[in-house]
Structures are given as C-alpha cells and as structure tokens.
Curated annotation (Swiss-Prot):
Compositionally biased intervals (Polar residues): 355-377, 837-852
Tissue note: Expressed in flowers, stamen, pollen, and pollinated carpels.
Cellular-component GO terms for this entry: extracellular region
Protein name per UniProt: Pollen-specific leucine-rich repeat extensin-like protein 1
GO MF annotation terms: structural constituent of cell wall
Annotated source species: Arabidopsis thaliana (Mouse-ear cress)
Record region (Contains the Ser-Pro(4) repeats): 651-956
Extent of the LRR repeats: 39-59, 60-84, 119-143, 144-166, 168-191, 192-215, 217-238, 240-261, 262-285, 287-309, 310-332
C-alpha cells in the first residue's frame, strides 16, 4: 500500500515537470509583447552614459583569459555582453560563444586588421535569420574593426545604441526585419565608409534626416517603417543606385532634385501620402530601370518627360488620381516590359498602351475612365475628376507657381476674389469651433462612388496628412471659410469640382487598394498645414489661386486642425459664391485625420492598411514577414515588393476628403442624387481612425451645424443646397427679418448641425454622408449659378434665426420657396439654390448670400480628396460654376454671401438630417439685419462649413 501511494505523488510530479518543460520550450519559441517590453527595459538599464561606452571599459573588466591581442579581448567583452542580452536563441546560434577564441564563434568572422595586417580582428557579424530575441548592448561599441554587421530577420528590439558610432569602418549595416524603434538611427550618419544601409521592416519613426542623402551610399532601404515627413530636397545629392521609401508616411511632393540622381537604378514610393504632380525632372533619370509611385495621391497628367527614361523596364502609377492621356512616347519606351497605370482617371490612351497590343510588354489600364475598354470606372465617378483636370503647370510639385504639394491649388485660379470675403473672415473666427462639427459632413465625403477613396483624397488634399484624419473636429475649418475668398473664384467653377470627389472613389474601386488614395491626401494636407495660418489672410489676394487659399484658412480656425480649415477659406472669398465656403468644411475632416494620417494614406490601394506594422506596437509580430530581406542581394527588390501593399494603411487617414462632395448637394436639383453617394460608405473606415478626435471637440454635434452658424445668417439664403431639404419654407418667414443680423445667429446653427452627425458620426457617419454628397455634386453646379446673384442681398433675409431652427428638417420645401423670396431676401433663402433667387439676387442683396457657397463647403472636403484634383475641387466648390458669373453680382452683398456658404455646408450633410442646420443659419440673419450686410457676411462665412444640413433657408 505504501508503495502505491508513493507512486501516485511521483506520477503527478512527473506530469507537472513535463508540463513545465513544454511551457518553457514554447515560450522560448515566441516573443510576446510583454517580453519585448521587458527586453527593452533591460536594454535601457544597460545603456549607461546615454548609450555610449566609457573609454576605459576594457580595463574595468577583469579577465583571466589570454588573447592574441587587445582587440580580440575587446571583442570578447562585447560578444559576451551581447550573449547575455539574448532572451531567446531557438537555434542555439550562440551556444559556442564560450572562451577566448572569438573567431570560432558562430556568426563571427575575423580578418587581418586594415591598419595592421599582422593583427587578427573581428571584422564581421552575421546572425541573419537566427530568430534571436534580445537587444543590442552598448558594449558592441567595442567591435571597432567590424565592417559588416548583419542581423536581419531576428527579434531584436529597443534602440540602436549610440556606442555603435565607434564602428567607423562600417561598410554594410543590415538590421532589417526586427523590432527596433525610435528615430532614424543617426549613428549611421557617423560612419564615413557606409555603403549599404538596410533598416526596413522595423518601427523607426519621425523625420528622415537630410544628411542621409549626403553620404556616399549605394543602397538605402527605408521601407516599412513609420517615417513621416517630406522627402528631403537633398535626395538629389545621393549617389545611391537603389532607394526605397515604400510603406511609410511620407507626404508632400517628390523633390525636383530627383533628376540629379545620376546613379539611380531603382526607386520605390509605394504606399505613402505623397501628392501633387510628378516633377518633370523625373525624365532625367536615364539609368532608372524601376520606377514605382503607386498607392499615393498624385494628380495631374503624366509628364511628357517620362519619354526620357530610356532604360526603364517597370513603371507603376496605379492607385493615384492621374488624369489625361497615356501617350505613345511612354508606352513605346525601348526597354519597357511592364507598365501599370490602373486605378486612376485617365480618359485616353494610345493604341500602343492597350493591354494585349504587344507580346513583349504588359499593360494594365483597369479602373480608369477609358471609353470602349472593359472594367472602367462609371461615368459618375469619372465626370467630377475628368471635367476638372489639374493644371500641373501651376502646381508647386511640378515646378509651376501653384500652391503646395497638393495639386488642389491648381484647380481654380479663376477666382473671383470676392471682396466680401474679408468680412467673412472675422465671423469665421468665432464660429470656427462650430464648424468643426462639420466633420460629420465628412461622412458625406462619400462623394459618391469613390467613397473610400474619396475620403482619403479629400483628406490628403487639404491637410496633407495627417490632420485630416484626426477629426474634423477642429472647428477651425469654419475659420478657413473666411479664407475662402481666395478660393472663391474657383468656387464658381466648383460645380465641376464636386464631381472630382468621385475621383477618390476610383481608388476605392480597388477595395483593397482603396487605401492608397488616402495617402495622397494626407500628404497634401501636410504642406498646407504650415501655410494655413498665413493663408487665411492672403485669401483675398489669393483669390486667383483659390486652391492654395484653402490651406491657409485652416490655421485661422483652430490651432490644431488649421490645415483643414484652409480649404474652407476659399469658399469665404467667394462670398457671392458662397458655395466656396463649403470648401472649408472638407478640410475639417481632414484635419483630424491629419494626426493619423499620414499614416493612413492612400486608401484605396491598400486596404491593407494594416499593412504596416505601424499599427501595433512595434514589438508585435508584424516584422516577421520580411525575414529574409536582410540578404543584401535581394534586399533591393524583396523589401519593396512586400511594401507595395502594406503602405495602404496610411491612406485611410484621409477619409475626410469625402466630405468634399457634400457641397454639391447644395445644388438642390441634385438633391435626389445626393443619396446616390451611398457608395461612400467605405469612407467610414478611415473615419474611425479619427473618430476619437471628434470627441475632442464636443462640438462634434455641431459638426455640421457649426458651419451653418458661421454663415447661417447670410447662408440661409444659400442654403440652396439644403433647399433640397429646406422645404423649411419657414425660413422664408424670416424674410421680414431680412435684417442682416443673420451673422450672429450663425452660431445658433451650430447646434443643429451637431445633431446631424455629431462627433460620433464623423467616425461612422462619414459613410452615410458619402452616399448623398456625391450625386449632389453633379447637379449642384447648376443651382449655384442662380444663388450667387441673389446672395448679394439675401443675407439680410437670413436674419430670421427662428425659421432656421424649424427648417432643420423641412429642407425639401426650401428648394423652391426661394423664388418668391427673390423679391424679399428671405423667400429666396430657401430656393436660393433655385434660380429664382438669382433674378432677385441682383436686386436683393440677400440672395447674394450665396448660400451655395456652403455647398462648396462640403466640397472643401472634397478638395482634399481630390488630391490630384484637389485643385479642382477647391475652385470648384460645387455650385460655383453657375454662380461664377453671378458671383460678381453677389459681390456687392458679398458679406451676406459669406453666410450663404455656411448653409451650403449643411447641404453636404444633406443626406442626413444635417440639412436642418441650414435653417438655423437663417435665424442669424434676422439679428444682424440692420447692422449691415458687411458684418453679417463674415459671421455666416465662418459657419459655412457645418451648414451641410441647413439647405432649407427660406430667405434665399
């Protein structure tokens, strides 16, 4: 009996022991996030003296072992310290790292010293694919004779210690496919002999130091990290033959200095937030064999100088927003074997570019706007973009006088530069916060088809990056409205712009690709950001170049999101062209994104957004995929290929852009179309990223309404867009109030808008809005035509704030009620959109309210989305086209008009209740009535953003 009882406990113990052993081995094979964090803490504790080593460290270590020379002793100290930093070594790579014979250690290579051939030293370390988990201790700085350091495809984490700067003979440094974090490893800048730098597939972040291109490097692999900045202009000094920027968060333009890279053979930009037109200097890259700029936010036409790429074998421009004609000069390049230009907006191609036209060359023209070709975008998606192509001769990126990396500037210089704008600015300021709510408009982004892409474009456009995503919350956007003046003239054209929105869509098409488009936006936003604050002032002067003005605008509004606001600002300018004001709205969206975005990037392309390991903590697993990249030989290509898709993630950031389209809704006639946008649904995804931002601005609710408030007084008139819904003839009752007080009321509206999308909506609502906004754009243009004239005087009518409230939903009626009002400012308000107002407009300043401008508002968003077209959008604030002519008339009443824009904004949201806000707008007018059109206008402008819903203003 005793023996049996003894066996039982023993058996249990044996089982427990086996279980423990199995767990141990399992844990050794995987590195959890907690373990990675633990390793990082251990490294930080080991990094004394700021990660550097004391000069006398070898004397501090007492060794009884004998070494052939002091350099091998130092190597022994370094390698033993490193072995202790190994947390997991599944292949027992360091099992024989014992004893003084360091040259026999696995992965360690010795050679005669360069300065003394009689001395044997450790010259190289190669632990590629060893799957070791650990960190780099500062003692590695003792390996001063190492020229080759390869540790790719492991699980090393933490930072690159500063002590490695002592490895002055470093020739090849490969730490790819690990889990390193922190800024760019600047120790690489201190190695005079470095030729090969491979840090891809890690989690390095921040800006890329310009000095990296001053070094005599042959290969630079930066792909699949978290770098976010513009590409330094110093790139032209680089002697590298291979450079990969893929799957990061780079934004802005491709520097024109790229044409000076005479040794360049391969360059890859896949999956970033780059935007604008391609610089003509690319044609000077005579030795390039691979050029990949896919999944970004590039716009305009392909430069004719590409015919100078005599040695190019592969070119990929897919998932962007290129337009125009693909010529024979490119497709007949002598060594070209693969040319992909799918998922863009090309509307023509030479016969030699048609897939299947050549047995030796492969072409892909899928998802463009080509007639008589299969698998192309719908006319609805193409019209907005193709009808307003980006003029690269005026684009900053292509060397023109345009504004900023965003192509948007180029769009419409037409601009009226309405003087009213000025006044508007002030109003905007106050309302700004409200406008933020506009974000909800973002949903509208849906710009019909593009929906996903669409939003991404928008964002990028304005903000250039990042902010867009965040959240439009930054009420700021409204602020920009004032700026709109600049844009204004363009706005008139706006009608067309609206269409562009779809453009983003194209990316969407891709579904997975969608992301790419986004990126584009982000980039755009970035550049603008800086300018934004200044921009606001210029607005007026910018008139001509509306495109840029938008950017500036943002600054005004809210420190945080200013960039986005810029867009809005153009609208302001237009005053008469209220539509422009809408523009600002889009920015809003973008702004928030910006934070993200950049990351998020070109949406469509890579739905893969996840793509980059960015998401999770660097430590997470994402790194594994590239394991082998390390190998130098492949390094060049392999990394890139994977990156291709990963980049997409960043694009999401831009979802905001979609809002851009909302402006179109103002059209009124389009109202029905408004809903067609449903597709935009996709945009929502991106929004999530920013959704948080919206919370920030409790205003969210105001999201849409805010915009309206700004302009509401005057806007009411324009609510035209909303008019669709505006049935709120009630607004008309306000007519009596015509007084211009409207401006003050503007704030009132902010509340209504919120209801529409309220912050949350931004996150998800974006999708819904998209649905409507797109269609409207198409029609919106026409309506605007009339509203502008009336706007001039209409502002006063808006005064009656009371009406606005009720109008919130009545929107439908408003559309036509305006006609009656022509005579009186108020009546027009509703129909503002309707032509009736136009007639009266001339006489009644109120109509002048260019309620339509609001439409543009939503468009604003679009501008970003456009990214490549962004310019177009800007100018195009949906209604503007028609209004353009009228604009002038409105100018007189200009101030009122400012308000109108606000309303328009509501329109964007139109699909949602948002239209209601527009009514609110009306109320404000009553207050300011006597004051003077001038003051009124400014206030309205501010809100232009949010008003999406307001369409209903009867006054107009």
């Amino acid at each position: 009996m005793t023996r049996r009882t003894m066996e039982k406990p023993f058996g249990c113990f044996l089982l427990l022991f086996c279980f423990t052993i199995s767990i141990f081995f399992y844990s050794a094979a995987a590195l959890t996030d907690e373990e990675a964090s633990f390793l990082t803490r251990r490294q930080l504790l080991a990094l004394s003296e700021n990660g550097d080593l004391p000069d006398d460290i070898e004397y501090e270590v007492d060794l009884d072992l004998k070494f052939a020379n002091n350099r091998l002793k130092r190597a022994y100290i370094a390698l033993q310290a490193w072995k202790k930093a190994f947390y997991s070594d599944p292949f027992n790579t360091a099992a024989n790292w014992v004893g003084p014979d360091v040259c026999s250690y696995k992965g360690v290579f010795c050679a005669p010293a360069l300065d003394d051939p009689s001395v044997l030293v450790v010259a190289g370390i190669d632990l590629n694919h060893a799957d070791i988990a650990g960190y780099l201790p500062p003692e590695l700085g003792l390996l001063t004779d190492v020229a080759l350091f390869h540790v790719n495809s492991n699980r090393f984490c933490g930072v690159i210690p500063k002590s490695l700067s002592k490895l002055t003979l470093m020739y090849e440094f490969d730490v790819s496919n690990n889990r390193f974090v922190g800024p760019f490893p600047t120790v690489a800048l201190s190695w005079p002999s470095l030729k090969f730098l491979d840090i891809r597939y890690n989690d390095f972040e921040g800006k890329l130091p310009p000095e990296i291109f001053d070094k005599d490097l042959d290969a630079i692999f930066l792909n699949n990290n978290r770098f976010e900045s513009t590409i330094p202009e110093t790139i032209g000094k680089s002697t590298a033959s291979v450079v990969t920027f893929a799957h990061n968060k780079f934004s802005g333009c491709i520097p024109k200095t790229i044409g000076q890279m005479k040794n360049l053979n391969e360059i890859v930009f896949i999956g970033n937030n780059l935007s604008g037109c391609l610089p003509n200097e690319i044609g000077s890259l005579n030795n390039v064999t691979v050029f990949d700029a896919s999944s970004n936010g590039f716009v305009g036409s392909l430069p004719s100088t590409l015919s100078g790429l005599a040695n190019v074998e592969q070119m990929d421009f897919s998932y962007n927003k290129f337009t125009g004609f693909v010529t024979d000069n490119i497709c007949k390049l002598p060594k070209l074997s693969n040319f992909t230009f799918s998922y863009n907006f090309f509307n023509g191609e030479a016969q030699s570019c048609v897939p299947g036209s050549s047995q030796e060359k492969q072409f892909d023209d899928t998802s463009n706007c080509l007639q008589n070709r299969p698998n192309q975008k719908s006319a609805k998606e193409c019209l907005p973009v193709v009808s307003r192509p980006v003029d690269c001769s005026k684009d900053k990126c292509a060397g023109g006088g345009g504004g900023g990396s965003n192509p948007s500037p180029k769009p419409t210089p037409t601009p009226k530069a309405p003087e009213p704008k000025k006044e508007i600015n002030p109003p905007n300021l106050e309302e700004p916060s409200k406008p933020k709510p506009e974000e909800s408009p973002k949903p509208q982004q849906p710009s019909p088809k593009p929906e996903t892409p669409s939003h991404e474009p928008s964002n990028p456009k304005e903000p250039k990056p990042e902010s867009p995503k965040q959240e439009s919350p930054k009420t700021e956007q409204p602020k920009p409205k004032p700026e709109s003046p600049k844009q204004e003239s363009p706005k008139q054209e706006a009608p067309k712009p609206e269409q562009p929105k779809p453009k983003p869509e194209s990316p969407k098409q891709e579904s997975s690709k969608q992301e790419p488009p986004k990126p584009e936006e982000s980039p755009k936003p970035e550049p603008p950001k800086p300018e934004e604050s200044p921009k606001p002032q210029p607005p007026k002067q910018e008139t001509p170049k509306p495109e840029e003005s938008p950017k500036p605008q943002p600054p005004k509004q809210e420190t945080p999101k200013p960039e986005e606001s810029p867009k809005p600002q153009p609208p302001k300018q237009e005053t008469p062209k209220p539509e422009e004001s809408p523009k600002p709205q889009p920015p809003k969206q973008e702004q928030p994104p910006k934070t993200e975005a950049p990351k998020m990037g070109s949406p469509p392309l890579e739905s893969p957004v996840p793509n980059d390991p960015y998401d999770a903590s660097p430590i997470k697993k994402r790194r594994p995929q590239p394991p082998s990249p390390s190998t130098e030989e492949t390094k060049t290509t392999s990394p890139q290929s994977p990156p291709v898709h990963s980049p997409p993630p960043p694009p999401p950031v831009h979802s905001p852009p979609p809002p851009v389209f909302s402006p179109p809704p103002p059209m009124h006639s389009p109202p029905p179309p408004v809903y067609s946008p449903p597709p935009p649904v996709h945009s929502p995804p991106p929004p999530p990223v920013h959704s948080p931002p919206p919370p920030v601005h409790s205003p969210p609710p105001p999201v849409h309404s805010p915009p309206p408030p700004v302009h509401s007084p005057p806007p009411p008139v324009h609510s035209p867009p909303p008019p669709v819904h505006s049935p709120p003839p009630p607004v008309q009752s306000p007519p009596p109030p015509p007084v211009f007080s409207p401006p003050p009321p503007a704030p009132i509206y902010s509340p209504p808008p919120p209801p529409v999308h309220s912050p949350p909506p931004p996150v998800h609502s974006p999708p819904p809005p998209p649905v409507h906004s797109p269609p409207p754009p198409v029609h919106s243009p026409p309506p605007p035509v009339h509203s502008p004239p009336p706007p001039v005087h209409s502002p006063p009518p808006p005064v009656h704030s009371p009406p606005p409230p009720s109008p919130i939903y009545s929107p439908p009626p408003p559309v036509f009620s305006p006609p009656p009002k022509p005579v009186t400012p108020l009546p027009p308000a509703t129909s503002p959109m309707a032509n009736a107002p136009t007639p009266s407009s001339s006489e009644s300043g109120e109509i002048s309210t260019p309620v339509q401008a609001p439409t543009p508002d939503s468009e604003d968003i679009e501008a970003p989305s456009d990214s490549n077209h962004s310019p177009v959008f800007k100018s195009s604030p949906a209604p503007s086209p028609d209004s353009e002519p009228e604009v002038e008339a409105p100018v007189p009443s200009s101030e009122p008009e400012v308000e109108a824009p606000k309303q328009s904004e509501a329109t964007p949201s139109s699909s949602p209740p948002s239209s209601n806000p527009s009514p609110d707008v009306t109320a404000p007018p009553s207050e300011d009535n006597d004051d003077g059109d001038n003051f009124i206008l400014p206030p309205n402008i501010g809100h232009q953003y949010a008003s999406p819903p307001p369409p209903m203003f009867p006054g107009y």
